A protein has these predicted regions:
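Pre-active-site segment of Zn-dependent metallo-hydrolases
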Residues: 4, 25, 29-68, 79-83
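A short helix->loop->beta-strand "cap" motif at the edges of active sites that frequently abuts
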Residues: 32, 87-92
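Short hydrophobic/aromatic beta-strand or adjacent loop that forms the aromatic wall/cage
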Residues: 21-23
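Active-site metal-binding loops of divalent metal-dependent hydrolases
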Residues: 38-41, 71, 98, 120
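Glycine/small-residue-rich loop that forms an oxyanion/phosphate-binding "nest" at active or ligand-binding sites
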Residues: 68-71, 78, 94-96
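Metal-dependent catalytic neighborhoods of phosphoester/phosphodiester hydrolases
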Residues: 77-87, 102-106
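Active-site environment of divalent metal-dependent phosphoester hydrolases
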Residues: 42-43, 72-76, 100-103
Length: 120
């Protein structure tokens, strides 16, 4: 497990960890772990990435929710989402309709594990 998975969060507090690019993990005192915009591709050309490997293995975090902010490739990444789903099949994916449509068509994640959100 990644060290963030073992971080003890006091009641009323929130743990935050940055995983590079725009990916963050949020953890509360009840153990909910939300991954925001996970982008961990395995094909990492040196001209585009600082590190040759992803900053975390998706199976190393007990992910309960994934929050996608919008449908750009580095915010809604089917490759990463497929690995999260294989490791944590009960994790819920939350995002705007465009992201959720992509999730439903390009991954094995079903509609019962997704929630559409909208501005307003």
């Amino acid at each position: 497990m990644h060290p963030f998975a073992h971080l003890n969060i006091p009641q009323g507090a929130l743990g935050i960890h940055w995983f590079e690019q725009n990916a963050y993990a949020l953890k509360d005192s009840q153990g909910h772990l939300v991954l925001v915009d996970p982008y961990f591709p395995h094909d990492r050309p040196a001209e585009r990435f600082v590190r040759p490997t992803p900053p975390v293995d998706e199976a190393a975090l007990p992910i309960t929710h994934v929050l996608l902010t919008h449908q750009h490739g580095d915010h809604t990444n089917p490759e990463t989402l497929r690995r999260i789903h294989r490791a944590w099949p009960e994790a819920k994916v939350i995002g705007p309709i465009e992201s959720i449509q992509q999730v439903l068509t390009e991954t094995e994640i079903d509609a019962g594990h997704t929630t559409v959100i909208a501005a307003g």
